[in-house]
Amino acid sequence: MGGDRLENKTSVSVASWSSLNARMDNRFATAFVIACVLSLISTIYMAASIGTDFWYEYQSPVQENSSDLNKSIWEEFNADEADEKTYNDALFRYNGTVGLWRRCITVPKNTHWYTPSERTESFDVTKCMSFTLNEQFMEKFVDPGNHNSGIDLLRTYLWRCQFLLPFVSLGLMCFGALIGLCACICRSLYPTIATGILHLLAGLCTLGSVSCYVAGIELLHQKLELPENVSGEFGWSFCLACVSAPLQFMASALFIWAAHTNRKEYTLMKAYRVA
């Protein structure tokens, strides 16, 4: 009689533990899947942001194609390693867009700067020039374009950070994904703590990059005022980077929570089984 009661009690305890363990596994697995989806979306957004040229956009009135000044500006913009003032003047005048790697302007399609008197948008084409590595790491001057005005260290390091930090962020996320894949293969959530930490660092890098870019643009416009009737705004590439940062933070929180709580619950369940 007593043996039957003990056996029934043991059976109930085992069944209860199995049910609780299954519920916990489902909860942690759900958090892990959601974190993976957020991580994937933020990676796509970050990669698209890095690879596109719409971090900042200028809107300017139509320029006269026959102007010798406009022709000269285009030729200087198209030159290798044009100075900062030269290419920014072109961006201001020709509806320019700027990315991390390239700068683009909208110019007449005819290379000889001749168009019919009735100009339409069909005669416009976008021309882009890539920033060379020398330009990416070149010093910025207190007076843009004037090499004798002294080096502006703040703008110099803001530019370098806005260029480097997105790549660091993307690299951290890829490394975190590799660790997460290993965790899946090992059927253990605990290694995902490292994945969560890497995503947290990636989010900080993305946030730092966005902050550096905003500060750099504001300082540039203090040095080079926009011409009359020209306006500027942050583009969709910049917005993708802004959205990517909170996604990285949310993924990080879910990864760390799932790994930490799963280990804690597993320890409690192990102690319960022993008891």
Mark where each language-model region is.
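Juxtamembrane loop segments immediately following a transmembrane helix
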Residues: 206-239
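Juxtamembrane/interfacial segments around transmembrane helices
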Residues: 82-96, 220-224, 247-257
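Cytosolic juxtamembrane regulatory segments of membrane proteins
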Residues: 8-17, 59-75, 195-200, 228-232, ...
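Signature of small four-pass
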Residues: 2-7, 11-58, 159-216, 241-244, ...
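Extracellular structured ligand-interaction cores
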Residues: 35, 97, 101, 162, ...
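A surface-exposed beta-alpha-beta supersecondary segment
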Residues: 56-160
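Long, compositionally biased interface segments
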Residues: 224, 232-266, 272-275
